[in-house]
Every structure is written in structure tokens, then in C-alpha cells.
């Protein structure tokens, strides 16, 4: 997407940007935490050609059917256009994922974050978004009042909206969505437990959060050897249920095996696993992505596995970071063939 930002609960003109003052930007990581999936296709390749573009796209995304919707007063007539515009801007959920690819024009999707705050997403040609079933959202064109969209469906094309209220809250799709939001995050080695398995979603918060975790772990394990495995992998693509990164899908089993080896050597309570999900839209084509430029992570490609152990003679202090307390012993993109136990 071109941009995303928080907006107030009430807006005067839905077709304006309606940014907060000062502006509060959102991020792909915030959207990913709420279940939103985003991908951008080359706008020069995006079109409504059935055999040349749409059918191959459906196969790639594992969907079965589609339709093309052209929303504008010129196409629908002013009265019908405004009626649909009002309907689309009512906060609602669907019982199926809502998958949209912008072909022409532009518009705004408003979605609720995990704290029930509105985030506005500006979508332009080539932008594809998956709004998960059960998530409250709404849509509007911008002031151009013109957008052409490819709608993608698992089965027959349909658009059934359940406006926010008691009925929507009781739908299985809504309950399942909320359950997923509050469920422990899954990693390559099992569910996050806050003790030996962790997952940190936000790159810019990594150092602060991992420093707290590291200091606590070193205090708890002061009399026992400790190994920390950090696994950087592509985040989950909801259209497949797997990582968007094919190599990460293949590496998942090998990562689990290597971590089991660490557990066998250090003990299950002294082998620690941290998964860092990498959002496709933040990472691809971005040389300044935080994990790429981080002094320790130095991410060159995903997947990447690092194994660290406590640094000798490390001294804790108020401004000491996690990477001052740990030494990198193993760094690999080829998990299957790497010895993770050689930490000397």
C-alpha cells in the first residue's frame, strides 16, 4: 500500500485523508498483527485480462473465482454510487476473507487494529489486500470517486456484510478471529510460552524488548550454560497458511530439528528460541529494513538462523543492550547443513 495511518473515530468527510494531528503512522507489522495481509503487484502488469492475468493470479493465491467491480458515478449513476458508498462505509465484517486487488483508481480501506483503533490504508493500482473473516472494516473511494477492483473469492462471488453489532459478534467468523488474535503466537518450534519460546513482531521495538528478556534470562540461568536461537523468517501468508517465503517453508522442519539438538545439549529450560517474523512488504526491496542494518542481525536473506551464547566478562549496566551481553556463535541461511552445537 502507498501509506497507512491512524484516523479518528469520527470523520467529517470520509473521502479525505483524515489523519490525526500530529500524524500517527501505522506499519505493516501492526497490520500483520491484526491479520491483514498485503502484497503489491507491478501496476503495469495488473489488468482485467482473464487468461493473461486473472486466472494465473487465482491459481497463485489458491482462490477459485472472481469478479471485477467498477465504482464511479459515471459507471453506476450518481444515486446508485452514493447508495453503495454509504453501504461500504458502514463498519462490518464478512464470514469469508475479503480479497481485493486494485486495477484502476484508488481508495481507502479502514481496519481495526488489535486495540480497536481505526487504521486507514491507501490502496492504488497493484495493491492487493486480504482482510480476514471476522475483522471489522469499511471502504471508501477518495475524492476522485473512481476505483476499479478485482474481487477474489474461495467459491462463488458474493458480498454479504454484517454490520457491527450483537449479531455480528455472535458469528463464528468473529469469534474465531478474536480467538486467533488472543492465541499464543506459533513459531517453528511451538507456541510462544514467554519462558523458553518467544516471538517479537515489531523491528523497531526489538532491542528494547530483547534486552529486557536477555537480562532476565541471564539472571535466571546464571549457573547453567545458555543458548539463544534467533530465527528470522517470512511472516505467514493467509492465502496459503504458510510463510510467504518458499525457502522458509522448507526450512521450518530443519529449524525445529536444530533447536531440538540445542535442547538435548543444554536442557529444555536452557535452550531459548526467539522467532522474528519478517513482513514481506517491509522487507522486499528495502535496503534500510531494520533487520538488514542491525549491527548484530545483519539480515541478508530469509530464512536466517543465529545461535548466541552469553558473552564472557559482559558487564550489565543501565544502557547495556542485549547484543552487549551475547556473542553470535552461529549464523546461517542453510539450516539443514549447519552444526548449531559448535558454540566455542
Curated annotation (Swiss-Prot):
Keywords: Amino-acid biosynthesis, Cytoplasm, Dioxygenase, Iron, Metal-binding, Methionine biosynthesis, Nickel, Nucleus, Oxidoreductase. Ni(2+) binds at residues 92, 94, 98, 137. Fe(2+) binds at residues 92, 94, 98, 137. Its EC number is 1.13.11.54, 1.13.11.53. GO terms for cellular component: cytoplasm; nucleus. It catalyses: 1,2-dihydroxy-5-(methylsulfanyl)pent-1-en-3-one + O2 = 4-methylsulfanyl-2-oxobutanoate + formate + 2 H(+); 1,2-dihydroxy-5-(methylsulfanyl)pent-1-en-3-one + O2 = 3-(methylsulfanyl)propanoate + CO + formate + 2 H(+). Its main location: cytoplasm. Its cofactor is Fe(2+); Ni(2+). GO terms for biological process: L-methionine salvage from methylthioadenosine; methionine metabolic process. It comes from the Eukaryota. The keyword Iron applies. It is found in: Cytoplasm; Nucleus. Pathway: Amino-acid biosynthesis; L-methionine biosynthesis via salvage pathway; L-methionine from S-methyl-5-thio-alpha-D-ribose 1-phosphate: step 5/6. GO terms for molecular function: acireductone dioxygenase (Ni2+-requiring) activity; acireductone dioxygenase [iron(II)-requiring] activity; iron ion binding; nickel cation binding. Catalyzes 2 different reactions between oxygen and the acireductone 1,2-dihydroxy-3-keto-5-methylthiopentene (DHK-MTPene) depending upon the metal bound in the active site. Fe-containing acireductone dioxygenase (Fe-ARD) produces formate and 2-keto-4-methylthiobutyrate (KMTB), the alpha-ketoacid precursor of methionine in the methionine recycle pathway. Ni-containing acireductone dioxygenase (Ni-ARD) produces methylthiopropionate, carbon monoxide and formate, and does not lie on the methionine recycle pathway. This is Acireductone dioxygenase. It comes from Leishmania major.
Amino acid at each position: 500500500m502507498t501509506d497507512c495511518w491512524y484516523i479518528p473515530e469520527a470523520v467529517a468527510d470520509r473521502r479525505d485523508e483524515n489523519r490525526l494531528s500530529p500524524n500517527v503512522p501505522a506499519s505493516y507489522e501492526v497490520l500483520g498483527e491484526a491479520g491483514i495481509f498485503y502484497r503489491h503487484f507491478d501496476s503495469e502488469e495488473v489488468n482485467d485480462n482473464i487468461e493473461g492475468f486473472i486466472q494465473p493470479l487465482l491459481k497463485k493465491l489458491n482462490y477459485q473465482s472472481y469478479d471485477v467491480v467498477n465504482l464511479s458515478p459515471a459507471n453506476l449513476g450518481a444515486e446508485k454510487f452514493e447508495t453503495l458508498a454509504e453501504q461500504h462505509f458502514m463498519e462490518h465484517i464478512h464470514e469469508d476473507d475479503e480479497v481485493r486487488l486494485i486495477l484502476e483508481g484508488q481508495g481507502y480501506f479502514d481496519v481495526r487494529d488489535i486495540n480497536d483503533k481505526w487504521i486507514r490504508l491507501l490502496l492504488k493500482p497493484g495493491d492487493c489486500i486480504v482482510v480476514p473473516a471476522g475483522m471489522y472494516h469499511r471502504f471508501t473511494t477518495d475524492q476522485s470517486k473512481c476505483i476499479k477492483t478485482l474481487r477474489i473469492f474461495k467459491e462463488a462471488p458474493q458480498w454479504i456484510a454484517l454490520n457491527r453489532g450483537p449479531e455480528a459478534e455472535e458469528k463464528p467468523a468473529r469469534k474465531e478471529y478474536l480467538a486467533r488474535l488472543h492465541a499464543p503466537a506459533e513459531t517453528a518450534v511451538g507456541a510462544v510460552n514467554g519462558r523458553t519460546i518467544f516471538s517479537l513482531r515489531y523491528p523497531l521495538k526489538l532491542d528494547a524488548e530483547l534486552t529486557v528478556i536477555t537480562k532476565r534470562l541471564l539472571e535466571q540461568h546464571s549457573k547453567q550454560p545458555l543458548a539463544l536461537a534467533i530465527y528470522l523468517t517470512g511472516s505467514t501468508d493467509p492465502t496459503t497458511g504458510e510463510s510467504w517465503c518458499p525457502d522458509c517453508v522448507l526450512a521450518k522442519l530443519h529449524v525445529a530439528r536444530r533447536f531440538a539438538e540445542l535442547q538435548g545439549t543444554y536442557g529444555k529450560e536452557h535452550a531459548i528460541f526467539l522467532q522474528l517474523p519478517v513482513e514481506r512488504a517491509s522487507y522486499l526491496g528495502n535496503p534500510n529494513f531494520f533487520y538488514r542494518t542491525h549491527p548484530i542481525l545483519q539480515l541478508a536473506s530469509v530464512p536466517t538462523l543465529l545461535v548466541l551464547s552469553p558473552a564472557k566478562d559482559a558487564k550489565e549496566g543501565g544502557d547495556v543492550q542485549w547484543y552487549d551481553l551475547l556473542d553470535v556463535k552461529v549464523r546461517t541461511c542453510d539450516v539443514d547443513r549447519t552444526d548449531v552445537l559448535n558454540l566455542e
